[in-house]
Amino acid sequence: MTATAGSNKRAIRRALVSVYDKTGLEDLARGLHEAGVELVSTGSTAGRIAAAGVPVTKVEELTGFPECLDGRVKTLHPKVHAGILADLRLESHRQQLDELGVAPFDLVVVNLYPFRETVASGATPDECVEQIDIGGPSMVRAAAKNHPSVAVVTSPARYADVLLAVEGGGFDLAARKRLAAEAFQHTAAYDVAVASWFAAEYAPVDESGFPDFLGATYERANTLRYGENPHQPAALYTSPEGGGLAQAEQLHGKEMSYNNYTDTDAARRAAYDHAEPCVAIIKHANPCGIAIGADVAEAHRKAHDCDPVSAYGGVIAVNRPVSKEMAERVAGIFTEVIVAPDYEDGALEALTKKKNIRVLRAPAAPAAPVEVKPIDGGALLQVTDRLQAEGDDPATWTLATGEALSEAELAELAFAWRACRAVKSNAILLAKDGASVGVGMGQVNRVDSAKLAVERAGAERAQGAYAASDAFFPFPDGLEILTGAGVKAVVQPGGSVRDELVVEAAKKAGVTMYFTGTRHFFH
């Protein structure tokens, strides 16, 4: 942001500076002083400015009132706020300032106590409360309200703009409006953080685990080419907590699209459902293949082999660093996106030979504890399904019929169960050797999902496969599709009023069946 020519510029002659984050403070203070700007400051900020050899007036010298109550009261004084809030366009305001002996401020530079960071550090409630800034937001909001007369800056990233503006005669009105908008965003995000902590942790209204207030703030990171379809404008926003897919580092390739982001998000979640090296290949938010292996190259080979036709133009997520061996294989297949925590030596060189593949680095595993789903007039909030239910542990499963599986066989069935979580309901997944071999997803009845999974697997791979169903079989017909294809074992939640009929069908076919008591609908 630079000052532009125009008669609505406000020269900067006097500045109030009070910052917690002192990044770039000395250079800012020197630059303002060299430009003839008078500096007024508080506490440690004033001390840092003075230590840099820059003349500064302490705010208590201005107010005639000492800083008190362990720093809780510093700037809450009429001689400070009148100087910020005076609308210099009005003769009456200018006259009152003269009568009161108050000089106006042209620039306010303030950033706030690190409340969010203090909470994240595990600090005690009293320590968190102490980091609730009072004077800072008051000055920021006052200056932002009075943007016709005052420029307000809340980020060190703007300091270079400040110095350019000072040299150029001040910020024009359009720039002051933009700075005011940033300032209100700054205080709004701060207030949401404080209110959310009170509602969720410090003073919850009940023990439901869901706060009575739900607030969130996002900043626009990028305007996307379009949304799901060309007639839908779209943009990417990031949360102040940072990290995650929205702030992944793009190492190569074309700009990410809306659909790229939705598929990549689904792929990362699917890959991180597994503790072993895992690769998930996703198309339209559904798996083309999920596999685990001794290493990521093996996992990718098995995941791709599940459905090579659908994997063409897919999105790949890996829960380990990508090896050169895997990268060379991926480079030979048309792939929209690959995302991983990192890339080993030689992997990026192999991938970047393909001009258009988007290569992302997202070091941390998906960690959102809750999911928010907007609906008309409101939103739904639920705890994220991380396969954390008791029934996700095979040790808790109930053998409904058939011979108990060996440890190795049970591990195969457990893989199928975990992989099935990533499939849109109604979901049936067939697996062999730690890899999906047939996926039936998104059908409105379980019979069609079973048919689709068997069809995708083919007769040879379906024979002896391990099958998982995200919800119970309401009738034996869906199960009979699987047993007719020769599956070895089935895992499902159970709980249908017709469980006896379903168990009888499995028993008749000589198929082992386990009940988990846990469902994994996914919409």
Swiss-Prot record:
MGS-like domain residues: 1-154
PROSITE patterns in UniProt: MGS
Biological pathway: Purine metabolism; IMP biosynthesis via de novo pathway; 5-formamido-1-(5-phospho-D-ribosyl)imidazole-4-carboxamide from 5-amino-1-(5-phospho-D-ribosyl)imidazole-4-carboxamide (10-formyl THF route): step 1/1; Purine metabolism; IMP biosynthesis via de novo pathway; IMP from 5-formamido-1-(5-phospho-D-ribosyl)imidazole-4-carboxamide: step 1/1
SMART domains per the UniProt record, alphabetical: AICARFT_IMPCHas, MGS
EC numbers, comma separated: 2.1.2.3, 3.5.4.10
Record key words, sorted: Hydrolase, Multifunctional enzyme, Purine biosynthesis, Transferase
Catalytic activity: (6R)-10-formyltetrahydrofolate + 5-amino-1-(5-phospho-beta-D-ribosyl)imidazole-4-carboxamide = 5-formamido-1-(5-phospho-D-ribosyl)imidazole-4-carboxamide + (6S)-5,6,7,8-tetrahydrofolate; IMP + H2O = 5-formamido-1-(5-phospho-D-ribosyl)imidazole-4-carboxamide
A cellular-component GO term for this protein: cytosol
InterPro entries xrefs: AICAR_Tfase_dup_dom_sf (IPR024051), Cytidine_deaminase-like (IPR016193), MGS-like_dom (IPR011607), MGS-like_dom_sf (IPR036914), PurH-like (IPR002695)
SUPFAM superfamilies tied to this protein: Cytidine deaminase-like (SSF53927), Methylglyoxal synthase-like (SSF52335)
GO MF, any single term: phosphoribosylaminoimidazolecarboxamide formyltransferase activity
Record GO biological process: 'de novo' IMP biosynthetic process
Family: Belongs to the PurH family.
HAMAP family, sorted: PurH
Domain remark from Swiss-Prot or TrEMBL: The IMP cyclohydrolase activity resides in the N-terminal region.
NCBIfam families per UniProt: PRK00881.1 (NF002049), purH (TIGR00355)
Record-given protein name: Bifunctional purine biosynthesis protein PurH
